[in-house]
Amino acid sequence: MLTDLLSRHKQEFLPGLHTELRAQCSRTRGVSFVSGNLMGNTRQDTSGVCCRVYKNGVYGFSSAAEYDDENVKNVIRAAGENAEFMDSRVRKGRPAFPAIPYSSRMTDAHINEVSQKTYIDYLKALDDYIVGKYPNLASRTLMMREDSMEKLLVTSDGVDSHFAAPRSYIYVILSALTPAGVPVELFKAYGGRGSFDMNFSDPAELYGEIDRLYESVMKKREGVYADAGVKTVILGSELAGMIAHEAVGHTVEADLVLGGSVAGPNLGKQVASPIVSLTDFANEAFGETAPLPVYVDDEGTPAVDAPLIKDGILVGYMNSRETAERFGMKPQGNARAFAFSDEPLIRMRNTAVHPGKDKIEDMIASIDDGYYLVNTNNGQADTTGEFMFGVTEGYEIKHGKLGRAILDTTVSGVAFEMLKTVDMISDKVEWTSSGFCGKKQPMPVGMGGPEMRCKIMIGGR
């Protein structure tokens, strides 16, 4: 864990200027098998220190790849000089940020080192199980990834934070051939918050999950193409989370609002069905710890929930301290940086649609001709809210019952229009948190939601 070398250098901050001093250690561990062959075996650690100084509307930033007292002094000095230089040239003349009351947050997470052999042996046991029980698969891929970001932060406002965020996942991809000889595959991630040894102890614990994934692949190999057009569908939790993050979340990040996103003219207006609410959660959601909790952001702002849509009305944005001043809002802890050499950007944390009151069985029974879209493997949206997502697992709904699996397809639409068609929401939320958001810097995020019944454009053959 990082040793605090920062606190002793607070007296070197330039008087009267907002200063953020951050040390960081980021680590990744990875192993991958493809059809029984070890294809990847990696370990990486990066660490360093950075400082950012705000003066009259401009920032000075400096970072160093070695974390020691000399480099701490150097980045404080260089960031201050850069801020002074920028201010002398740009002269924005903006006021100082309101002070954040003193706060201290010490980490309660632990990062436990595990040998690469442990990762390899675990995946090898899973691979042996798959090939022994399911020899008819066309291919199989297993990957393990563990990563963590540990940060020490002190600011001129008196914020003092030490935070560690380890997470670990195993990814399984199973592929089979259709009767026509065309490969189809399904992907599933297992794991979550915590080091590898906290989430995975016995490979046999995943055998049941792999069995269920295999059964789904076998259904998909007999699948049919969806009928193209606007259909009544049930979006599974993964797709609801993708909508929340990609199609809505990015449009309500305040820096993108300033860039002209669709959320700008829609603040305070109806953008979804009255039964839809959506929040970017800081560290707790629906009575439980969020998948990737954030307690203090990299500007030193204490993290609190950011309500975005309430009862169908767009009620807020996600902000940095600077954009919060611009919009007359309160910062809620959304400014985060990926590496020690990165400046904080407005980022999502754990973004989800709130659960409703409906049972998934009743939702399926309510549809005479439609689809249940379970999983997605990719998606993109622009700042107008227009989106297109891939669907890798889905099923027909015929006369209120689940039917045949469907082959890979896509769904598309405009978020604020599609969300107005939501008329049923299930009472259970599921999360995904195994990937990264790619907005300029990669960033671990959580996203999720309940199943939602809506109308959406679906692709066909």
Question: Which residues does each predicted region cover?
Answer:
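N-terminal small-residue-enriched
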Residues: 1-461
